């Protein structure tokens, strides 16, 4: 059900998701790009079919939001009843994950520390980390400066000893 309109691209399942599904389902099989495209189109058509039917069921029950129950009824009415048990399992997993997320976000609220105080503490930690980083950078710079000075002194000392050695050689040449 692909068309040339730009909107259809927004309504397809991401290729990465399809590729992952194919690889998990058929791990030792190579699948041609045309076959992958066909799977994308079939999945998109299936989703459109189910969502349209669920929307009709939702409208008939005078609701404004499609619920999971509407989708399950749509599967049944379209002859996909064999999918319902698995759909219900996935729905339960999604609800569990959502509940865990809500609990995790409420943990922050239940800390008893206002968000402004947490932000202030975070800013203090960032400032302390920046200060420590600046001190380390300063120490490294000083060490590099000292190493450069030592190298200059060593070079000057070597140059002076070379000049002293060559002037003594000239004095020795004068004696001949």
UniProtKB/Swiss-Prot annotation:
Keywords: Acetylation, DNA-binding, Nucleus, Phosphoprotein, Repressor, Transcription, Transcription regulation. It comes from the Eukaryota. One of its GO terms (biological process) is regulation of cell division. Residues 152-167 have a biased composition (Low complexity). It is found in: Nucleus. A motif (Nuclear localization signal) lies at residues 100-103. This is Protein Dr1.
């Amino acid at each position: 059900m692909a068309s040339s309109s730009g909107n259809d691209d927004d309504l397809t399942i991401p290729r990465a998701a399809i590729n992952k599904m194919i690889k998990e389902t058929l791990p030792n099989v190579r699948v041609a790009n045309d076959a992958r495209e066909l799977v994308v189109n079939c999945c998109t058509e299936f989703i459109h079919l189910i969502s349209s039917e669920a929307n009709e069921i939702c409208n008939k029950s005078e609701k404004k939001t499609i619920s999971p129950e509407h989708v399950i009824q749509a599967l049944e009415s379209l002859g996909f009843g064999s999918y319902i048990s698995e759909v219900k399992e996935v729905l339960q997993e999604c609800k569990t994950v959502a509940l865990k997320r809500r609990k995790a976000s409420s943990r922050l609220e239940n800390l008893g520390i206002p968000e402004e105080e947490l932000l202030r503490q975070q800013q203090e930690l960032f400032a302390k980390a920046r200060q420590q980083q600046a001190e380390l950078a300063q120490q490294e710079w000083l060490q590099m400066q000292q190493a450069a000075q030592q190298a200059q002194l060593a070079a000057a000392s070597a140059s002076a000893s070379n000049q002293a050695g060559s002037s003594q050689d000239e004095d020795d040449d004068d004696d001949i």
